[in-house]
Amino acid sequence: MVRSFPPARVDRIIVHQFDPARPSPGGIDSCIRGILRYLPDGLDVAVLGVDTGFSQSGRRVGQWEEHRLANGRNFWFLPVASLDPANQTRRVPHSLRLMLGILRYRRKVPMTNVVQVHRMDSALAVRVLVGKPLAYFIHTQEDGLTGRTSDSIWRFAARAHRRLESFVVRRAKSVVVFNEAYSKFIRKLNPKAIFSPTWFDPLLIKRESASRDKFKILWVGRFEIPKDPVLAVETFNRLVQMDPGSPWSLDMVGSGTLLEHVRNEVNSLPPHTAERIRLLGRVPPEDVAAAMAQSSVFLMTSHQGYEGFPRVLVESMASGLPSVVTAGSDTGGLVDEGITGFVSSRRPDELAEKLTKSVSLDRDQVRNSVTRLDAPRLVTRILDLDHTELTAVGGS
């Protein structure tokens, strides 16, 4: 990172509570990192984001930075507010603080051809503050933010969210929906909308590890209600009861408001079970990839109706992990029953039984089932919507 100024005009501005210095839990952060890593040559991109407090010394809010990646690509970054997106106990919504920061530093924002946004409320504000065409990204199912298991404030105003999102979609230059079912509805509002699966970053994925543990289960996600980390603990407890002779273990990666609750749940288990569960907290993507390389099976316990196209499932399968998922969480239909994993009800005993079956599945078949979902290919397709003239968009 060096202090620098972007050109007077850039091709694209990305707006989100994003900090290149520290990854945050969730698919949006990973999406933005993938886009920045695989930018086409010659595309100038600036990011209006936040300072999480973990950057290199010398950073100042309101001061531009130039970030150069190992592959030679670069982008500009302007932190406009100080906040940690992973802190879900905030009193003031993160999106509001981000917009207030953009308002404060709007004179420093360059001209642009398109503004990329990942939230409906941010999109509404950006239309006023920046006044440029929108590239709107939707990461959830139709009622993903407003359903009963959502942790979004919009669950209290579902009708308003639906109307406002329709307003944004109709006026966007491009719309990318990471959920195939919802994309069909969105395309009725804006014919330019496309469906895109999420992707894995081939530079992060580790094919195999000499230390891969046949009995290690991995769970990755935010410790929030939609992801239901408590169910993972309950499932593991049942697994140990069903198969006490095998050295099963569970690594849980992530953080959130339920972390202490989960810790208490673990501590309440019998000691010989609790000692096999590790709560690893918030770790960078490289460490998540290493954990996937060392594990044997991936467990996903999200509630039905929330996930758009779960990126962590794509990443785990690209790492060769058979996956056991709760019904409704694999919205991309990636899990081929008995071949690449298993779909289960939310009953801990059924989840546990399918975990025992998953360790015998062929890792190469799992890995090969998602090879088409690599970041370089899908990022290029998405950016082509706004930055090249296309006669057709395949797979839409």
Where are the regions that the model predicts?
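A conserved mid-protein helix/loop that constitutes part of the nucleotide-sugar donor-binding site
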Residues: S30-G34, F215, R222-Q241, T257-E260, ...
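Membrane-proximal helix-turn-helix segments that form the acceptor-binding/catalytic region
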Residues: L103, R107, E142, R155-V175
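Active-site proximal beta-strand in glycosyltransferases
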Residues: V114-Q116, V128-R148, V175-V176, I194, ...
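Carbohydrate-associated surface elements
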Residues: A181, W199
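Nucleotide-activated donor-binding/catalytic signature segment of Leloir-type glycosyltransferases, i.e.
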Residues: R263-E286
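Acidic donor-binding loop of glycosyltransferase active sites
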Residues: A293-E307, L321
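Short hydrophobic beta-strand element within catalytic cores of glycosyltransferases
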Residues: P322-T326
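Conserved acidic donor-binding segment of nucleotide-sugar-dependent glycosyltransferases
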Residues: D336-P348, L355-S360
